[in-house]
Amino acid sequence: MSDLISALLLGILEGLTEFLPISSTGHLLIAEQWLGRRSDFFNIVIQAGAILAICLALRQKLWTLATGLGERANRDYVLKIGVAFLVTAVVGLIVRKAGWQLPETIQPVAWALLIGGVWMLVAEHFAGKLPERDVVTWKVAIAVGLAQVVAGVFPGTSRSASAIFLAMLLGLSKRSAAADFVFMVGIPTMFAASGYALLEMYKEGGFGSENWTDVSVAFIAATLTGFVVVKWLLGYIKKHRFTVFAVYRILLGAALLLWLPAA
């Protein structure tokens, strides 16, 4: 397979999995077993494509918040986004300084996919018994920030899955409201993570030699795919549960665990 096709597929995969509750990092680590390992810079660029995608998909909400800060409800919402982001940033930096690194084997990812799928089924079952609420509390904001760190430490967990379902269990029980808040928190989180990674790369000697055609194709693929996925998902969850994603995670995790001994 050519490097260009590989880059295209990885970009599409990033766009497909970044916002679905199935773990983009986990899927990229799995895909690299067949498509080849890419540079950290390449991975940062395709995540930037996903960032652009969600900004475009949520542009109306972003504009409403930016121009409506005079309203107390909008200020409160933005402050809670900020708190969730700060929790992620501070705890994430502590974890990073402690020497955490992504796993180089598939087994931890497989277990995270499997356990995360079960967690989704259980969490949605109990959240479904709560009265439907769309108010973001400070408790929810802090929990979402912590959930993002957990997802970063355990690839395969999924940032959106862990954060959305924890938010639902803690009172933000309306699925669409929980997803909206988690996606909004994801924007500064992904911006900061990408910026921090680029700064670290620069300090260590630059970005190395890259095939800019491959990088550009992957970026565009991630942006376009991510935009379509976000718009579709936000419509889907208004009428449907996350069950199909939970079942997919369980099946994929189990299949990988069965495949690993044979491989």
Swiss-Prot record:
Role of this protein: Catalyzes the dephosphorylation of undecaprenyl diphosphate (UPP). Confers resistance to bacitracin.
Broad class of where this protein is predominantly found: membrane
Record's protein name: Undecaprenyl-diphosphatase
Recorded GO CC terms: plasma membrane
Annotated GO MF terms: undecaprenyl-diphosphatase activity
GO biological process: cell wall organization; peptidoglycan biosynthetic process; peptidoglycan metabolic process; regulation of cell shape; response to antibiotic
Similarity comment: family membership: Belongs to the UppP family.
InterPro entries membership: UppP
Main EC class the enzyme belongs to: hydrolase
Record-linked NCBIfam families: PRK00281.1-4
Compartment annotation: Cell inner membrane
Keyword annotations of the record: Antibiotic resistance, Cell inner membrane, Cell membrane, Cell shape, Cell wall biogenesis/degradation, Hydrolase, Membrane, Peptidoglycan synthesis, Transmembrane, Transmembrane helix
EC id: 3.6.1.27
Residue spans crossing the bilayer: 38-58, 75-95, 108-128, 135-155, 181-201, 217-237, 242-262
Additional observations: Bacitracin is thought to be involved in the inhibition of peptidoglycan synthesis by sequestering undecaprenyl diphosphate, thereby reducing the pool of lipid carrier available.
Catalytic reactions of this protein: di-trans,octa-cis-undecaprenyl diphosphate + H2O = di-trans,octa-cis-undecaprenyl phosphate + phosphate + H(+)
Membrane topology: Multi-pass membrane protein
